[in-house]
Amino acid sequence: MAGTNSLGAGPDTPVPSKDTGFTPGDDTWTQMKNMFSILTGNMTEEGKEQFLLARDIRNEENDCKRCEDQRDYLIKYSPIIIRFLQDNIRQLGGDISSHNIHCRRCTQRQAGGFDPQYGIRICANAMKDQGHLEDTMAHEMMHAYDHLRFKLDWTDNLRHAACTEIRASSLSGECRWAREFFRRGQWKLTQQHQECVRRRAALSVMARPACKDAEHAKQVVDEVWDSCFRDTRPFDEIYR
């Protein structure tokens, strides 16, 4: 998910307070033991979170280095990022490039976030491959474009939040059929794109402090859906 979220990235070391099935340790034997506990159903959900956190801490340097290398490649060679979104952001007086696209380890389970003061944060430990990174960068760059063009109120206006989430999910490529079908197990053949955009926009709105609950998030998304889904600026159409 994206938007102006506070993305945690701390040095916490997982220490189980009870028997969760997770055993701390970075050696091969301990890793095999933890994997066996997961495969046999002997690790609780809390234990799985501890396992993932330990893995992310262990791989942090490599994850961030890979993310930065792929980020720099995409900025140089990806048409949607370098020649289009980046250029349109520049035309509005902004600048999104490697100096403010930060690859970090995140403790929240999301792909990235945008903050008008900070720039873009990519959760390096959540990136599955270069294609996933490209979609995430495009999503967050759409937020940057909307912030500059429409002067969004990120703090209190849920309609603004819903609109930019609809546009970012629709235009970034993250809701194209192949990604939904093969990565997320969403197997519908009709209205798949629209349902993906609605679902992801509502989840992002629901994470904001001003949103009461899931029903409130859905209501706000529905209120702005028609105008925001049809608005494909700066693109001529949804092409990914």
Curated annotation (Swiss-Prot):
General function of this protein: Has a dual role in the assembly of mitochondrial ATPase. Acts as a protease that removes N-terminal residues of mitochondrial ATPase CF(0) subunit 6 at the intermembrane space side. Also involved in the correct assembly of the membrane-embedded ATPase CF(0) particle, probably mediating association of subunit 6 with the subunit 9 ring.
Species this chain originates from: Ajellomyces capsulatus (strain NAm1 / WU24) (Darling's disease fungus)
Keywords, alphabetical: Hydrolase, Membrane, Metal-binding, Metalloprotease, Mitochondrion, Mitochondrion inner membrane, Protease
Root EC class: hydrolase
EC numbers: 3.4.24.-
Record GO terms (molecular function): metal ion binding; metalloendopeptidase activity
Name of the protein described by the UniProt record: Mitochondrial inner membrane protease ATP23
GO biological process terms on file: mitochondrial protein processing; mitochondrial proton-transporting ATP synthase complex assembly
PROSITE patterns reported in the protein's UniProt record: ZINC_PROTEASE
Residue segments, region Disordered: 1-27
Family annotation (InterPro entries): Peptidase_M76_ATP23
Binding site for a divalent metal cation: H139, H143
Family label: Belongs to the peptidase M76 family.
Cellular component GO terms held in the UniProt record: mitochondrial inner membrane
Keyword field contains Hydrolase: yes
Active site: E140
Membrane topology: Peripheral membrane protein
Compartments where located: Mitochondrion inner membrane
Matching Pfam families: Peptidase_M76 (PF09768)
Keyword Hydrolase: yes
